[in-house]
A protein has these predicted regions:
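Flexible, glycine/small-residue-enriched loop-and-beta-strand segment within the central core
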Residues: 10-75, 102, 108-110
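Beta-rich strand-turn-strand
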Residues: 67-82, 86-90
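Residue-level recognition of short, solvent-exposed, well-ordered loop/turn junctions
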Residues: 2-4, 57-59, 77, 93
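Extended, small-residue-rich solenoid/repeat segments and analogous flexible loops
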Residues: 1-8, 12
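Acidic, glycine-centered active-site loop in nucleotide-sugar glycosyltransferases
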Residues: 93-94, 99-102
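Short-chain dehydrogenase/reductase
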Residues: 63, 81, 97-98
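C-terminal segments of enzyme domains that contribute to small-molecule binding surfaces
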Residues: 51-64, 69, 103-150
């Protein structure tokens, strides 16, 4: 198994350990809780007397939301986002946002980021480095709550 630099891989991520040598995760990738990365499909092995194996390649700067399932034989292109709860059954191209079961391309990453930037101009927003779990003090928690009350 190859895991690049600056990869956020939570402990709850399920990795297909017997065939983990078929998994490659490049730099700057992130996963939400409870994701699964599968390199084999033994569902019909009783009937087929065989199992499907396939590489999983996750290119640089990809991010998968909570509960994403990545099936054997797929590549997720660089700079792509996958929505929470998605099932990746085929390749995801570079620079897109994909979601669903099976996952389909929703829009380009640039379109998504433009929409998010516009939202940040009108909604309360907070500098991530101050409010991530490592730096979230009681005072910052209280400030967040007060800012988000309506």
């Amino acid at each position: 198994m190859h895991i690049g630099n600056r990869v956020n891989l939570p402990m709850s991520t399920w990795i297909d350990v017997p065939h983990c040598n078929l998994i490659s995760i490049e730099d700057n990738c992130g996963f939400g809780e409870n994701c699964a990365i599968l390199t084999h499909d033994a569902l019909a092995k009783e009937f087929l007397r065989a199992t499907r194996l396939g590489r999983v390649t996750i290119k640089a700067s990809c991010h998968s939301g909570m509960g994403t399932i990545i099936l054997p034989g797929v590549t997720i292109g660089p700079r792509s986002f996958v929505g929470a709860g998605s099932v990746i059954t085929s390749d995801i191209p570079e620079g897109v946002v994909a979601a669903g079961n099976p996952a389909r391309v929703i829009c380009s990453l640039d379109e998504y980021l433009d929409r998010q930037r516009a939202k940040l101009e009108t909604l309360p927003n907070f500098k991530y480095s101050l409010y991530d779990f490592k730096n979230l003090t009681d005072a910052r928690r209280a400030y967040l709550v007060s800012e988000l009350e309506e």
